[in-house]
Structures are given as C-alpha cells and as structure tokens.
Amino acid sequence: ACAPCIVEAVQKRAAHPVYGYGVRQQPYYDAVMGWLKKRHGFEVKYEHLAFAPPGVIYAMNVVLRILTKPGDRVMVPMPNYDPLFDMVTRGGRKLVETPLVWKDGRYTFDFADMEAKAASGVKVLVLSSPHNPTGRVWEREEIEKAMEVYRKNQCIVISDEIWSDLTLNGHK
C-alpha cells in the first residue's frame, strides 16, 4: 500500500483547480544557476533567468512568432522533426526546405542549396542538434560554415539545443 502521506499529498494536489506547471521555488533557480556554473563555467544572476512555458517546441514557436510575421520565409533542413516545420506552416510563415544530403555514410548540410535559399530572403533558420530524425551531431566546422551563411544573409537562427548537456561520441 502507498504511504498515507503520499496519498494525502496527491489528494491535496488533485483538489487544486489548475493542473498546469506550478510556481518554481528558489531551490529550482539555485539548481539551474549551479548547473550552468558547474557544467558550462559561467555565472548567471537570478534576475537574468527567464523560463519558457512547457517545452522547447512551445518556446521555439513563441520565439518564431515574435521574430517573424505571417508570410516571412523560414528555412528548415529536411528531413526534420515534424513539430519544427509544423510551427512554421501553422503560424502562416512560408516553409523553405533545404535538403540534408547523404555523403560519406552520414547526412550533412547542402551548403550550396542553403546559401542560395538564404540569399532569397529567408528571415529565420530553425535547427536542432542532435538532429532529429537522423541523429547527427553536427561537427563544429559544419555549424561554423552554416552560421557564416546565415550571418552573411542576416538570417536569425533558432536552435533546439534541448540535448546540449548530453555529450555523444566525443562531441562537445
């Protein structure tokens, strides 16, 4: 049987009329600031912390809607995780696909296609790493080359880095 204190806590929470995310307490913020310092070596002040509502895709959608307006061109490498391109089309933005190409046993960016499309008025690029569905962890050189294309064409990059603390196969 379940301990009475657990049953009581569940009943108390279930009686609350809102089932959404609760208010974050100070220990949560302390843990985030501690992790950022320990893992990444930088200190963040409490007043500089801002947390998005539930989930990365929701947050990326909000950012996309703030940075663009309906009809703006948004590029997404394809294939890709459905919610990343769905947020573009459902928000009335123009989806511009840039294909990933199979080369030397793995997917990589088609830089020529990326460059041509970025120069055609793309406002935002949506990225993810590791890439979903291919699983590719982009090499530093690939990211730097892609960012140069977008910097040159004044494109904003929105990147899903939800797995940034997970290091795969020697990648950093």
Annotate each PLM feature.
Residues M78, E97-W102:
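Short beta->alpha connector loops at strand-helix junctions that form conserved
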Residues V32, M87-V88, Y150:
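Short hydrophobic alpha-helical segments of the AMP-binding
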Residues I66-V88:
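Conserved PLP-anchoring active-site segment centered on the Schiff-base-forming lysine
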Residues R90-V96:
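A short helix-loop-beta submotif of the ANL/AMP-binding
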Residues A59, P83, D165-L166:
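Catalytic P-loop NTPase motifs of RecA-like helicase/translocase cores
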